């Protein structure tokens, strides 16, 4: 019989009602895949993929890309996800998914980029929701697809541990590809741990929509690193923009709508924990760290703005100053240093002829906002060739942070300024900056993990910042649980289940059916002989009031493949165990 007390001793705080692992892959020896044109069926890519022309995933089909897949992109090629279609691209820290140039000597602009289109809201048509879809449809530039709608919670899939390199092909003088273009993308889309590197235009740009992003690294792009327009309303946390020594303009370029600065819905980005690193040696105009203009709203906090040529912040035009006056522009609790040769603010406060602003940007940032500091953040290294953007010992970035909103998106206990604290570098393993990580070893001894594996490169005393993250939450009437991302060095078997408030234990089998556990020998594995694991659960809507009150525990047990559960012992058998709980 199972000892409930013993098993509970291994289960720790987090969230679970039930845990369903939605993507786990068997390692195979994949052949080369060559693609181009229309994808009109559910499709899976793995191994080496050659993108030979523009490739469009049509609705309602899903493109799934397995960990470690490398996509080599020919000139003029690009990947477009239509409205209603999805991309499920989930790598791991050890095996990221990489989109790169097919050239033996890769360079910026070798191919296009990735464009994802959704049914999220925009202000580009002048028609407010609710409205027929044809009235709120926008045609994207450079052939990036149609987008827009009235569903802010639309999902276009998942991008996680993905790298996008050497894109930005220029169609003509007015149209070029961003590394990652998000057009009308809804907030049910998951975008985290994405690097856009050496793009010959913007790194990431939002055209309307409601997408939220986290752990984004934009490096060495020639134009703006982080850009939005057309009524974009979304959130971001842990974002890095790093300019090279030869090109690059702004850290953030933020617009509402060029044609109508008051168009509804008005752009609004809530951004916490950004690190924006410019290069004030580049002989280039328009080198601001943050440029809010054309009536955008912005809440930028707990961020570092360092080393930009023209200014740290430059508020432009009447509509944007009006936002600042009425509290819709917040730039506070930030560290600003070494911009404009140490002056930090340009006296030219507006590019709008005939308009005199009621205050300067400097007055706004340093006086009206009361918690910004003009001090050296003391980062380990801002060298563009060998950066280490974590704050060093004694850094002012380790104190003075505001508390992010407690809205289930933001990591609210990130109590530091910038995208990193002094310990954890989330770029390790999967980016061009972070080197490689060894695969996670198969367990050889009893190991119980609280949130993240101990003695593994993701350990962090703050569990919310650790990756692989083991956490979950209830939002929009759904349960979402994340239980880590790994590539194991050899196959493992994975068991999972829940414990109810009355003490009964249930396991979940390969068909996602639950079974009362009375003897470990009778427990069925959820998956066997697996080397990759990515865990994500989205359950249908439910009525929380219908659940019995008490504490619900969840567990994930990883053992060497072929383990005989009849002889399994928690005191001596090798395993990894993750646990979660929520009390109603």
Stretches with model-predicted labels:
Residues 520-540:
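Aromatic sugar-binding surface patches on proteins
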Residues 32-66, 74-92, 96-443:
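Extracellular beta-rich repeat passengers
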Residues 467-493:
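Contiguous beta-strand segments within globular domains
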Residues 546-564:
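Internal, hydrophobic beta-strand segments that form the core of beta-sheet-rich folds
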Residues 493-499:
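Beta-strand signatures of extracellular beta-sandwich domains
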Residues 13-25:
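Bacterial N-terminal signal peptides
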Residues 564-584:
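Short beta-strand elements
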Residues 442-475, 583:
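Short, compositionally biased P/S/T/A/G/V-rich stretches that sit at domain boundaries
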């Amino acid at each position: 019989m199972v000892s409930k007390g013993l098993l509970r001793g291994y289960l720790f705080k987090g969230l679970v009602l039930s845990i369903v692992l939605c993507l786990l892959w068997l390692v195979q020896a994949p052949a080369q895949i060559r693609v181009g044109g229309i994808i009109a069926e559910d499709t899976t890519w793995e191994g080496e993929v050659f993108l030979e022309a523009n490739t469009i995933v049509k609705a309602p089909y899903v493109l799934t890309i397995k960990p470690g897949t490398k996509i080599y992109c020919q000139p003029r090629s690009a990947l477009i996800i239509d409205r209603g279609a999805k991309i499920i691209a989930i790598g791991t820290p050890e095996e990221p998914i990489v989109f790169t140039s097919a050239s033996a000597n890769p360079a910026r602009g070798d191919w296009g980029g990735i464009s994802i289109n959704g049914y999220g809201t925009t202000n580009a048509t002048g028609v407010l929701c609710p409205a027929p879809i044809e009235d709120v449809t926008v045609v994207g530039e450079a052939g990036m697809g149609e987008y827009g709608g009235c569903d802010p919670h639309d999902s276009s899939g998942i991008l996680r541990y993905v790298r996008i390199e050497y894109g930005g092909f220029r169609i003509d003088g007015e149209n070029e590809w961003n590394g990652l273009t998000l057009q009308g993308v809804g907030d049910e889309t998951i975008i985290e741990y994405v690097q856009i590197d050496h793009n010959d235009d913007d790194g990431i740009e939002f055209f309307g929509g409601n997408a939220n992003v986290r752990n984004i690294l934009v490096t060495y792009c020639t134009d703006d690193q982080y850009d939005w327009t057309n009524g974009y309303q979304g959130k971001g946390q842990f974002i890095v923009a790093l300019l090279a020594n030869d090109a690059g303009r702004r850290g953030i370029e933020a617009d509402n709508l060029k044609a109508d600065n008051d168009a509804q819905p008005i752009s609004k980005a809530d951004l916490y924990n950004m690190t924006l690193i410019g290069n004030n040696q580049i002989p280039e105009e328009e080198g601001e760290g943050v440029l809010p203009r054309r009536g955008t709203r912005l809440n930028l906090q707990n961020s570092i703005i360092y080393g930009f040529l023209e200014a740290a912040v430059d508020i432009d035009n009447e509509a944007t100053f009006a936002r600042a006056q009425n509290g819709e522009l917040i730039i506070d609790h930030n560290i600003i240093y070494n911009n404009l040769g140490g002056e930090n603010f340009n006296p030219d406060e507006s590019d709008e002829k005939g308009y005199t602003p009621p205050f300067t940007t400097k007055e706004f940032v340093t006086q009206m906002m009361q918690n910004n500091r003009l001090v050296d953040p003391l980062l380990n290294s801002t060298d563009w060739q060998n950066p280490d953007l974590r704050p060093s010992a004694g850094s002012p970035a380790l104190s003075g942070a505001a508390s992010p909103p407690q809205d289930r998106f933001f990591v609210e206990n990130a109590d530091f300024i910038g995208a990193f604290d002094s310990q954890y570098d989330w770029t390790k393993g999967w980016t061009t900056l972070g080197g490689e990580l060894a695969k996670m070893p198969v367990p050889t001894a009893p190991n119980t993990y609280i949130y993240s594996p101990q003695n593994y490169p993701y350990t962090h005393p703050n569990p919310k910042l650790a990756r692989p993250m083991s956490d979950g939450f209830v939002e929009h009437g759904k349960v979402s649980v994340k239980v880590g991302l790994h590539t194991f060095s050899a196959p493992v078997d994975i068991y999972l289940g829940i414990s109810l408030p009355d003490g009964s234990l249930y396991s979940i089998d390969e068909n996602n059916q639950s079974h009362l556990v009375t003897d470990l020998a009778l427990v069925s594995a959820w998956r066997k002989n697996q080397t990759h694991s990515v865990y994500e659960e989205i359950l249908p809507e439910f009525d929380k009031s219908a659940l019995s009150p008490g504490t619900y525990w969840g567990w994930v047990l990883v053992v060497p493949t072929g383990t005989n559960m009849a002889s399994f012992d928690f005191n001596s058998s090798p395993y990894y165990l993750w646990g979660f709980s929520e009390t109603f």
